[in-house]
């Protein structure tokens, strides 16, 4: 987790600060794999579909709370925490990487990471999704897991087994091999050098209104009916 990244506007804002020293020392790395907002204050991302479009897997009621309250709450709190600080000039991913592991910056890290993760989650879903991937992604899945059914089972088992709050992820390692991992709380696999392709949110607020304690039913429904394979393929190609 030693790599750090900063956007070009940060050099001006960080002049004379400790963060500037980090930049000049080369501790902040190259451009982000995914860029979810370079301009602050950050805003709640626009969903790529109507808030009713994921029914019946995810209800409008859940979307209202999850997207409209929880996700928005992370955005608002992040803006509050970074106002008038050097972080206000940084991209979202740069903030996450710069604050990861720094206990004095835990509130900033948690909110920034949750904004990033939720942005990624909404893009990991699409109405009428699921089904079968194609092209190179399908080949990679077969190579890594045997076949699509085995992938689905492993993805489900991994996400469902996450203790407490967290996320299930399909990722690619540095060699391009696909893996399934889980992270707790606000953590994300790109902090460990893995490229996220898809994610499933297994915080209770993602499913409890619709599924109560039946996390497995929620996860399996998302995998079968909502996964956005086009998004995964785009990420794999980056």
Question: What do the predicted segments below correspond to?
Answer:
Residues 230-235:
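Low-complexity, Gly/Ser/Thr/Pro-rich intrinsically disordered linker/tail segments
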Residues 53-57, 98-103, 184-187:
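Acidic/His metal-coordination segments adjacent to aromatic residues that form catalytic metal sites
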Residues 61-75:
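Structured secondary-structure scaffolds
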Residues 37-41, 69-72, 80-89, 94-180:
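All-alpha RGS (Regulator of G-protein Signaling) helical domain and cognate RGS-like helical scaffolds
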Residues 38, 53, 77, 199, ...:
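Histidine-anchored, small-residue-rich loop motif
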Residues 1-19:
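N-terminal secretory signal peptides and thylakoid transit peptides that target proteins
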Residues 157-213, 220-227:
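An amphipathic alpha-helical core segment
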Residues 25-56:
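C-terminal segment of N-terminal export signals and the immediately downstream linker at the start
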């Amino acid at each position: 987790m030693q790599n750090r990244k900063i956007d070009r506007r940060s050099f001006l804002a960080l002049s004379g600060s400790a963060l500037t020293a980090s930049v000049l020392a080369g501790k902040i790395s190259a451009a982000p794999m995914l860029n979810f907002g370079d301009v602050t204050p950050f805003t709640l991302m626009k969903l790529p579909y109507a808030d009713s479009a994921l029914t019946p897997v995810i209800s409008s009621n859940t979307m209202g709370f999850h997207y409209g309250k929880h996700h928005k709450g992370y955005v608002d709190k992040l803006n509050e925490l970074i106002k008038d600080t050097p972080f206000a000039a940084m991209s979202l991913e740069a903030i996450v990487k710069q604050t990861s592991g720094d206990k004095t910056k835990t509130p900033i890290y948690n909110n920034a990471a949750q904004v990033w993760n939720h942005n990624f989650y909404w893009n990991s879903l699409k109405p009428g999704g699921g089904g079968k991937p194609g092209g190179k992604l399908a080949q990679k899945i077969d190579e890594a897991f045997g076949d699509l059914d085995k992938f689905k089972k492993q993805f489900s088992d991994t996400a469902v087994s996450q203790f407490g709050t967290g996320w299930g992820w399909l990722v690619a390692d540095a060699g391009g091999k696909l893996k399934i991992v889980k992270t707790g709380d606000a953590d994300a696999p790109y902090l460990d050098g893995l490229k996220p392709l898809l994610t499933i949110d297994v915080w209770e607020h993602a499913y409890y209104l619709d599924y109560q304690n039946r996390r497995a039913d929620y996860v399996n429904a998302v995998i079968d009916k909502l996964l956005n394979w086009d998004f995964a393929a785009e990420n794999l190609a980056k």
